């Protein structure tokens, strides 16, 4: 309750969820282990928009509850804070034991093929 007697929850205005630009109605059954060619797991077809498409929110809700999802969402930080994987000698012989990020690794490999 606010000081003026109104409830903050009553004054919230929700924004509509954007519609994904592709149709998900023909994506295979999740029990079959089928994934879309876009690399995104099967969407929850029980929560479509009136146009037969899933919204970002329904995809997010589905991916956070299913163990079959390929993408895990870090609710606290989001994907913007993801760190490049570290490559070591075990993955590429001759680089030494010094860890390096993906860009360094790519440059090291590419430099072998430059003329």
Swiss-Prot record:
The UniProt entry lists the main location of this chain as nucleus
Q: Alphabetically list the UniProt keywords.
A: Meiosis, Nucleus
* Described function: Has a role in meiosis.
* Disulfide bond sites: none
What top-level branch of life does the organism fall under?
A: Eukaryota
Its lineage opens with: Eukaryota, Fungi, Dikarya, Ascomycota, Taphrinomycotina
Q: What is this protein called?
A: Meiotically up-regulated gene 168 protein
Region (Disordered) location: 82-115
Q: What gene makes this protein?
A: mug168
Which residues fall in a compositionally biased region of kind Polar residues?
A: 99-109
**One CC-aspect GO term:** cytosol
**Source organism of the structure:** Schizosaccharomyces pombe (strain 972 / ATCC 24843)
